[in-house]
């Protein structure tokens, strides 16, 4: 017989306790799944999107980081250092801001924003003291670190790196908090990417190298100026016959071109970069699909760029590509011919094209579909290509510009202008009139006189 405690058996108490533990574990597991799969309305991310830091929230959306931050909040608390709006609007270098907003620099923008977020909760009361030095925290960015400290002699003013915390614990939520800071924190890797892109180091050509020179005395390559010369008074290297013989008639070799063995231009990487930019930018998936899957134009463009050519691509958006009929695409080689007409072997930006049409009125650009040219003119404050129903406006400027490839978005598919066949009219000569021979004047008078008296039958010619 089981022992009883206050009228209940020990076995009954044990099973009741076991079931309570299982129910608690199931409830906690269900709570974790819900927390990681769906963000609560009281989340710090929702607070950021609805806060005064509108510029930072807009950059987070443009960088496509909402899903990444939702996953981070589902795993742990986060601390966000949010720059004030004025720091992003007026204090930031316009060229640097333009660099961040270009679709091709999405990774740099993501690294910049993630370096403002620490994957743990750090409140203002957890700041190190003035005499304890700086405390290092790893951010969500790629190997980016933030140092927290207090400025000495300023009554405990808090610092993150070298930026002052202007609003400590500005927004606090159960899954994180937001501190307001005075300026943007720029990682060194992002600054190097900006400097490299601004100086065009990754795509600029190297200095040409001269052809090797041959010493006629030795029939060998000349050594550099720093090499040790033959001392004076030493015997000649070659016999006198070889020294007096005429040297080889060699023309100087050309300097190595862009498509040489050094591969100064990586055309394949640049074409792949601009196609990825089209996909991330949105609205040009059909154009990217034709370049990569339906044709081999991506490979051809990469080869051209590697050889030193520059290209400008007039990219029709998906809406324009959807208007193409089956007959226009079913002919052999039709997609290639259509795309060739949209590629200009020049480097043009929206500004350069607009300035040209404003200055010259109408401009014609060569295309890869030789000998057809695409015409451009100024219309409605923009650049209009083509004419009539087959025209298109430049409405999405400078989607991708890297100094070698320029992509400009247009709202229509261009076709070469069909020249009307001129009907050749054969020149007709003047109509020759047959002049009847006139009878003599005397004969006419005689016939008329004989006719008056009824004797005209006497002359057979009357």
Swiss-Prot record:
- This protein's major location comes to secreted
Function, as annotated: May be a cell surface adhesion protein.
Repeat as UniProt keyword: yes
- Signal peptide residues are 1-25
Glycosylation (residues): 32, 77, 293
Q: Does the keyword Secreted apply?
A: yes
Annotated protein name in UniProt: Fasciclin-like arabinogalactan protein 18
Origin organism of this chain?
Answer: Arabidopsis thaliana (Mouse-ear cress)
- Domain of life, per lineage: Eukaryota
Annotated disulfide bonds: none
Q: What's this protein's family per the entry? A: Belongs to the fasciclin-like AGP family.
UniProt keyword annotations, A-Z:
Glycoprotein, Proteoglycan, Repeat, Secreted, Signal
One GO cellular-component annotation of the UniProt record comes to: plant-type vacuole
The listed locations are: Secreted
Pfam families documented for this protein = Fasciclin (PF02469)
Q: Which classification does the entry list for the species?
A: Eukaryota, Viridiplantae, Streptophyta, Embryophyta, Tracheophyta
Gene3D superfamilies reported for this sequence: FAS1 domain
Outline the extent of the FAS1 domain: 40-185, 271-414
